[in-house]
Amino acid sequence: MNYIVIVAGGKGERMGNEVPKQFLLIGEKPILMHTIERFHEYDKTLKIILVLPEEQQNLWKELCSKYSFTIEHQIVNGGTTRFESSLNGLSQIPEGNDGLVGIHDGVRPFVSVNTIKRCYDEAQLTCAAIPVMPLTESLRIVEKNGNSKSVERANYYNVQTPQVFNIMMAKMAFAQPYQESFTDDATVMEQFGCKISLVEGNQENIKITTPLDLKLAEILINEKQPKD
């Protein structure tokens, strides 16, 4: 059996808004509902685990009632770090399950179904897969002495979610002590010794964290389904 852990722990501070960013409206309903719908569209048998701060859970339930949102999902308390939140989600998966689990940012509602499929298909073959997109702007690295130099853009990618892993390997990897070098879930797996496979993401799969992102999201939601 396959799972998706959707981590939604934002507080909306960078938005300058008291409403948690995952609850902000685009297309007349909360961002988080669009995100969950995308995975349900990919696979209606996928088990959905929503990781949400405890103090936000009553509001979420009220929103589900208000917007008649009925896609089945399990709610789990968020942690103080992304690592802890992902771990809390993984802990709800029964032991001995040899399926796949994706971990996804709750504020990425425009991930395409084909991107999701590519991640799960590749992880089935290789144990760990993440979606990436090539960079389009030039890069420079700043050295300790303050000097900078250009770096080869082709060697770098923007990393997206969902990041999909073998469940048993993910549970073992997240049993490691937390390290500050864990910038995302894939780095936890990498530290454990898993090779990370890269698959093509989709350009619209933005993480909505700033007012500008929200404006872009409002444009995207009024267009047709995300391109692959």
Short names for language-model regions:
Residues 46-48, 100, 128, 195:
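Residues at the starts of beta-strands that form the adenosine-phosphate
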Residues 149-159:
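A recurrent flexible, glycine/aromatic-enriched loop bordering the glycosyltransferase active site
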